From Swiss-Prot:
Keywords: Cell membrane, Membrane, Transmembrane, Transmembrane helix, Transport
Annotated localization: Cell membrane
An annotated GO cellular component: plasma membrane
Job of this protein: Involved in multidrug efflux.
InterPro entries named among the record's database cross-references: SepA (IPR031396)
Membrane topology: Multi-pass membrane protein
Name of the protein described by the UniProt record: Multidrug resistance efflux pump SepA
Length: 155
């Protein structure tokens, strides 16, 4: 009987953690959606972008959502690839300081444009606007998540 109590306790804790994870993920996706909706309205108002795909709610969600997911996957992949190069080539001057960040930014912007953006004909955003948006994301990443030591590494 003690085993059953212990098992139900672990199941309850797992469900609580899973509930917190799902709720926080839903809140994050809601804020992301509102932020991207606001960004799209700003781009339309300033005549910097045009979003001409307007079917139903779910069609729009799949079309624009896949644009965001593929863009995120591209940015994430290039970021990890650049970190891999930086780790394996520590003495290379291109992977140190501002050179590393400029190369990461340029490669990420160009790859996003040619891998994702040109295939979405209903999303018309100028290249320089994409450069500014991705540059802003890089600045936010460096401000809020600077390179730091692994605090769990005990030596």
């Amino acid at each position: 009987m003690k085993f059953l109590k212990n098992k139900s306790y672990h199941l309850l804790v797992t469900l609580i953690v899973l509930t917190i994870f799902v709720i926080s993920g839903a809140i994050f996706l809601t804020f992301l959606g509102f932020g991207l909706y606001g960004l799209s309205r700003i781009l339309i108002y300033l005549h910097l972008g045009d979003f001409s795909y307007n079917k139903g709610f779910y069609d729009n969600l799949i079309y624009y959502g896949s644009y965001i997911v593929l863009g995120y996957f591209t940015l994430f992949s290039i970021e990890h690839l650049m970190d891999y190069f930086k780790k394996n080539l520590p003495k290379n001057p291109y992977f140190q300081g501002i050179n590393f960040h400029l190369i990461s930014y340029i490669v990420t912007t160009i790859m996003f444009y040619f891998i994702v953006h040109i295939h979405y004909v209903h999303v018309n955003i100028h290249f320089w606007v994409i450069m500014i948006i991705i540059g802003f994301l890089f600045v936010c990443k460096e401000v809020f998540y600077p390179e730091s030591k692994n605090l769990n590494n005990k030596k």
